[in-house]
Amino acid sequence: MTAGDEEAAAATALPVTIELLLASPRSRYVGRPADGPEPPPAASELHESVELRAGLGIVGDRYFAKPAHRGASVTLFAAESLEAVGRLLGLGRPLDASATRRNVVTRGLDVDALRGRTISIDSGDGPVLFRVNRPANPCAWMDQVLAPGAFRAMRGLGGMRCEPLTDGVLRLGTATVEVDPADPRDVHPA
């Protein structure tokens, strides 16, 4: 790699923070929202780090290796989107990102602008490549677990469903994101 190549690579690396990592062995939002969510499992669903497998998802998560979720086994969500939902609803309190059931919550990245892109996230253990495939649409449970009106307010702000393309580990804390340099579109920090 030449000095020019290194400068170009550094220019495309976006500094972000991974604020939350969630891997749950089962879905807690089943049945009718009015009945409330199932209780959390004995083991914590929130993790300091998660292990990913190419094409399969997060080890230990409910969508890991499920054929129906190929291409959508990992959800990526921006903390700023949840803050925008709170403002739209006129709430004077922060919303709990873990209630959204998104796997990876970041700060400093416009996640919803990444559709159709390939990205890498490196939190210190080497880059993990993802294909960002489609929106992670909210469900009616959001009205129950976040706040009334959250289901509608999250439309277009629900994050993205991704497929890991490489094995790797993600950790809480600082990270860098690189957007596929072959793609001419430009993604800006949130």
Go through each PLM region and give its residues.
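Electropositive, beta-rich accessory/interaction domains or terminal extensions
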Residues: 1-125, 129, 134, 187-190
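Short, basic/aromatic beta-hairpin or loop at an interaction surface
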Residues: 93-100, 144-158
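Short alpha-helix capping/helix-loop boundary micro-motifs
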Residues: 106, 159-168
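Loop/turn positions that initiate beta-strands
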Residues: 116, 127, 167-175
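Short, surface-exposed secondary-structure boundary micro-motifs
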Residues: 124, 135, 175, 181-182
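Well-ordered mid-protein domain cores that form the structural environment of catalytic cofactors
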Residues: 136-141, 150
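Short, Lys/Arg- and Gly-enriched loop/turn segments at beta-strand edges
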Residues: 140-142, 182-190
